[in-house]
Amino acid sequence: MGNITAKLVKDLRDKTGAGMMDCKKALNETDGNVDKALEWLRKKGIASAEKKSGRIAAEGSIGSYIHTGSRVGVLLELNCETDFVARGDIFQSLLKDVSMQVAACPNVEYVSIDEIPEDVVEKEKQIEMGRDDLSGKPEQIKEKIVEGRIAKRLNELVLLSQPYIKDSSLTVEDLVKQAAAKIGENIKVRRFTRYTLGEGIEKNQMDFAEEVASMKSN
């Protein structure tokens, strides 16, 4: 068994937000290996959060984030079970972090895989099935390759599947479940909207010469 020091326990706690006793137990269970202890705690945290996932989360808060330069803005609804938790530092910090994550992920359109419409999934499948590099391959192998590519593509569209911008060893889903384990309540990302300045507006690309010509003709 590795030498489990107080500093090692504290470092693991700082990384995971788990309690001191849980961190010590994780290190004992993994012979003092921090990476394995981190994984052990993550699994424990996820299991803890999943026990709460069936409970109704009807309280919460709507957060906003405006990125530097005011060119990207986000509105995000995060739900929990009680108003008391919604006002707390852990919940509000999570709300801010997830809102920032949305701002940093322009391709994200859905909260979870379950929200992706079937027609979008089917369209992605047709695109992948038609790729040149799959021609001539046996159907069974082709299906397997396409399945992997579709899963990768769909995860790119989903907020909860994104690597957390402040710690890429975690996903956004991990982050939410860690917070749920800390506060002892179910937490759900309900919905979000991302705004980009000028998005959808057709800009007039008229050059200077054309502009002068149009002025003369008036």
Curated annotation (Swiss-Prot):
Q: Does the keyword Protein biosynthesis apply?
A: yes
Q: List the disulfide bonds.
A: none
Write down what this protein is called: Elongation factor Ts
Which family is this sequence assigned to? Belongs to the EF-Ts family.
Q: Provide the alphabetized UniProt keywords.
A: Cytoplasm, Elongation factor, Protein biosynthesis
HAMAP family of this UniProt entry?
A: EF_Ts
Q: Where in the cell is the protein located?
A: Cytoplasm
- What does this chain do? Associates with the EF-Tu.GDP complex and induces the exchange of GDP to GTP. It remains bound to the aminoacyl-tRNA.EF-Tu.GTP complex up to the GTP hydrolysis stage on the ribosome.
CDD domains cross-referenced by the UniProt entry? UBA_EF-Ts
UniProt organism field:
Prochlorococcus marinus (strain MIT 9312)
UniProt cross-references to InterPro entries, sorted A to Z: EF-Ts_dimer_sf, Transl_elong_EFTs/EF1B, Transl_elong_EFTs/EF1B_dimer, Transl_elong_Ts_CS, UBA-like_sf
